[in-house]
């Protein structure tokens, strides 16, 4: 006899990013633990899921066993955007088990829960805090076996009632000898750590039966909207990017500087990533602004994450107009203690929302400083993952990187990430006849011919102007070029 495979329906939690790390949602009728230290966000997560899932056809019961009345808890939870007062006492009902717990009689506690569940027939049941049940049982003198039997009976009853259940508790370590961990189908562990003045919240799905969850710790943030989980960007096979990066007929995008497009071999190939590296004030942000402005002129949309100054400053009025009209999306980088996964998620969301073809990250140096200290340690690996994820969107990405002008050390990124990008443009300062001049060159364009010239360039009110290439000089990359004997200064042609 052939036994058909049982299909598990997955509930969409309503918590941004959580369904992704759960592997597609929460298994219906599962018996789950939401664990963590005090203040880690357990009750907020439970309420956000409850209000997101509860409907008239799928009602929820929330049992509180805390010493404080539900009204006090609701006073704080209703400050969040997800709180829906119209659902209270209709699709969402609260019950206080404090009196039942005080006796330490688990039979009475189970009887009370059973009676309310039978009366209201909920699809969702929450018990907060379940650790209070454990402490009350121990203080009441009952045996550890009694607690284990209570948990097993509760799990069996919830399954027979076809209710998806959540036990919320203050647990500090997964290896505690606690019977509830064995019975649970799923465990969502919330953590928070403090390093210097930085507070970082992380979530881990330590257990979820029947689900291929995303392993590891995932950062999340609590705002007025509630909890937002930032799953690591997924490197899917399907993307809008050009799948054949070696194709000789690549579609090209203009950077907004015609001469620089020529140096690139006709523009930047669509879907490529470009690193613009140079010292402070060399014109990196201006080039980034020209890239976005040119896209706007051609009817394209873009996204910018500016970490050093507001996007509408130093990039001209055209950028401000594009932002105000909604054709350029701006990533808010003012939040403290960000993670690379958070910024990547915000970028990808904006790219999909606007169907953006151009993305600017200005700059990687500011990007690193915006991160919580714990995330700076693996910045290179996280950045590599983010660049790969952005490539799957099909957008063309321009990143800037500030370098110290060390002329004895030719580097294009302080993070050793230059190899991750498809193309590199370098900007440098040189001294000629006691004057500071700017030069630029295209270092690489993957699978494409490009100019090898070092070209002078100026910056005026209209942006970047590429001048002639430097001929008759030696030691340009050393910062102090010397003119070959008998050759005049070619830059004098523009004087």
Where do the model's predicted regions map?
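Conserved P-loop NTPase
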Residues: 2-4, 8-9, 111, 118-120, ...
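Pre-Walker A adenine-sensing motif
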Residues: 14-25, 256-267
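Short beta-alpha junctions and helix-cap segments that line functional grooves
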Residues: 49, 170, 174-178, 189-192, ...
């Amino acid at each position: 006899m052939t036994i058909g495979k049982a299909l598990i329906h997955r509930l969409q939690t309503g918590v941004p990013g959580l369904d992704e790390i759960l592997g597609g949602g929460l298994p219906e009728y599962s018996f789950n633990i939401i664990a963590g230290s005090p203040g880690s966000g357990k009750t907020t997560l439970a309420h956000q899921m409850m209000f997101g899932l509860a409907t008239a056809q799928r009602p929820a019961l929330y049992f509180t066993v805390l010493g404080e009345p539900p009204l006090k808890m609701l006073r704080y939870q209703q400050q969040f955007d997800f709180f829906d007062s119209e659902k209270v006492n209709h699709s969402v009902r609260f019950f206080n088990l404090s009196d039942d717990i005080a006796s330490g009689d688990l039979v009475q506690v189970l009887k009370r829960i059973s009676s309310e569940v039978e009366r209201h027939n909920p699809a969702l049941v929450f018990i907060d805090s379940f650790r209070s049940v454990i402490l009350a049982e121990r203080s009441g003198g009952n045996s550890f076996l009694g607690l284990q039997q209570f948990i097993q009976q509760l799990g069996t009853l919830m399954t027979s009632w076809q209710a998806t259940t959540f036990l919320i508790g203050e647990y500090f370590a997964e290896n505690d000898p606690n019977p509830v961990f064995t019975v649970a189908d799923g465990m969502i562990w919330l953590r928070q750590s403090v390093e210097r003045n930085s507070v970082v919240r992380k979530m881990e799905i330590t257990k979820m039966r029947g689900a291929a969850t995303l392993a590891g710790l995932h950062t999340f943030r609590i705002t007025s909207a509630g909890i937002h989980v930032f799953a690591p960007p997924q490197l899917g096979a399907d993307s809008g990017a050009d799948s054949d990066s070696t194709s000789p007929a690549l579609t090209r995008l203009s950077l907004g500087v015609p001469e620089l497009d020529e140096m690139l071999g006709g523009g930047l190939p669509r879907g490529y990533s470009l690193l613009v590296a140079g010292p402070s004030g060399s014109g990196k942000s201006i080039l980034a602004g020209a890239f976005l402005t040119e896209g706007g002129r051609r009817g394209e949309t873009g996204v910018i994450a500016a970490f050093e100054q507001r996007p509408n400053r130093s990039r001209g009025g055209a950028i401000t107009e594009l932002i105000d009209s909604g054709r350029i999306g701006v990533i808010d980088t003012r939040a403290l203690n960000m993670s690379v996964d958070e910024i990547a998620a915000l970028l990808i969301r904006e790219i999909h929302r606007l169907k953006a073809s151009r993305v600017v990250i200005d700059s990687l140096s500011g990007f690193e400083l915006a991160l919580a200290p714990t995330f700076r340690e693996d910045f290179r690996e996280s950045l590599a993952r983010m660049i790969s994820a952005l490539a799957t969107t099909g957008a063309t990405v321009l990143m800037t990187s500030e370098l110290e002008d060390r002329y004895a050390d030719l580097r294009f990124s302080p993070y050793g990430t230059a190899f991750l990008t498809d193309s590199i443009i370098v900007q440098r300062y040189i001294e000629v006849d006691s004057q500071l001049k700017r030069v630029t060159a295209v270092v690489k364009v993957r699978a494409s011919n490009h100019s090898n010239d070092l070209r002078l360039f100026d910056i005026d009110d209209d942006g970047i102007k590429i001048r002639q290439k430097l001929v008759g000089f030696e030691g340009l990359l050393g910062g102090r070029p010397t003119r070959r004997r008998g050759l005049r200064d070619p830059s004098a042609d523009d004087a």
